[in-house]
């Protein structure tokens, strides 16, 4: 059986308020639970007008309170910018409020420009090379298993209850897969960012996995942009707004999701068209028949049975319909 989950970046459409965007996130999470989705995760992005999810832990609390069974999590917390102890306590707090429903996905991404990173850490310069140590510390705190010789031995990440959040690592290749495997935690491959290295990353994860207090067996999924419409032609039209938005993001432009009309009128250069063609490798677009076959091909290639999808189209109604069609295909 294929499981479906959602990664919500809370993309803001042009002409829409972030307030409305976040209200849409609540509605979509409630609907996705009804449709049978397994998880609903929020991304973390800073100093941008185009994405409204800056604090996934707050969105998790909101969504978990408005739903009943779907797992809710982060995709992911920018661990290099924070204290592992604080992150662990925040997610233990959420787990105490919503037992067996909380996922802690963490990433190594610096989180933006150098200035943004310094603002996040209040001027303290942190190194990405500390990520392995930070990840291990989060794992220790979540499982209350700090070694006796650890500098923080005796410290407890509260509240202490009988369950703990699931711990996942987000990554784009072999190093992150190996890191997750060696620590016995879940692995999320970002196909929607880098579609080239997934097969090898999943193979390394499976072959190198060491059972842990988090997972006894390898647990992996991949994230991908998906637009599922009635026909291939309709899906292609819906994708125009996402194409232009990704093009602008790739150029470092802080952009909200444009309308289809704006995308059609945009003066694309030959270089733009080539970039859009490359970006299409990061997504699956088409009718239900087209989408189902392509996603099944990917799950077979990656040898996983869970897909986490994003759909950053302009129109919210079209977005809902895409997610519902996906559910009808697999759930």
Curated annotation (Swiss-Prot):
Listed InterPro entries: Bact_Lucif_Oxidored, CmoO-like, Luciferase-like_dom, Luciferase-like_sf
GO molecular function, one term: oxidoreductase activity, acting on paired donors, with incorporation or reduction of molecular oxygen
Top-level taxon of the source organism: Bacteria
GO cellular component entries: cytosol
Pfam families: Bac_luciferase
NCBIfam families, per the entry: oxido_grp_1 (TIGR03558)
Family of the protein in this entry: To bacterial alkanal monooxygenase alpha and beta chains.
Name listed for the protein in its UniProt record: Uncharacterized protein YceB
Organism: Bacillus subtilis (strain 168)
């Amino acid at each position: 059986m294929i499981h479906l989950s959602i990664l919500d970046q809370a993309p803001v459409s042009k002409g829409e308020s972030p307030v409305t965007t976040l209200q849409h996130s609540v509605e979509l999470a409630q609907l996705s639970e009804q449709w049978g989705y397994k998880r609903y995760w929020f991304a973390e992005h800073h100093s941008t007008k185009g994405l409204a999810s800056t604090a996934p832990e707050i969105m998790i609390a909101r969504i978990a309170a408005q739903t009943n069974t779907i797992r809710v999590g982060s995709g992911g917390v920018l661990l290099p910018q924070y204290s592992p102890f604080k992150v662990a306590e925040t997610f233990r707090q959420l787990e105490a409020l919503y037992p067996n429903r909380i996922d802690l996905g963490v990433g190594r991404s610096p989180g933006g420009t150098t200035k943004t990173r310094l603002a996040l850490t209040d001027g303290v310069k942190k190194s990405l090379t500390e990520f392995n140590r930070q990840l291990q510390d989060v794992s220790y705190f979540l499982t209350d298993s700090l070694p006796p010789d650890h500098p923080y031995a005796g410290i407890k990440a509260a509240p202490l209850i009988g369950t703990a959040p699931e711990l996942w690592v987000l990554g784009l290749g072999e190093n992150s897969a190996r890191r997750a495997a060696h620590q016995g935690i879940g692995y999320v491959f970002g196909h929607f960012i880098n579609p080239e290295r997934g097969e090898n990353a999943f193979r390394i994860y499976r072959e190198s996995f060491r059972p842990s207090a988090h997972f006894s067996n390898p647990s992996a999924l991949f994230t991908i942009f998906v637009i599922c419409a009635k026909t291939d032609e309709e899906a292609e039209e819906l994708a125009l707004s996402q194409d232009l938005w990704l093009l602008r993001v790739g150029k470092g432009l802080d952009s909200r999701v444009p309308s289809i009309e704006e995308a059609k009128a945009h003066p694309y250069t030959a270089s733009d068209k080539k970039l859009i063609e490359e970006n299409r490798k990061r997504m699956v677009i088409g009718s239900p028949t087209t989408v189902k076959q392509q996603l099944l091909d990917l799950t077979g290639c990656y040898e996983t049975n869970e897909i986490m999808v994003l759909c950053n189209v302009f129109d919210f109604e079209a977005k809902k319909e895409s997610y519902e069609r996906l559910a009808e295909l697999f759930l």
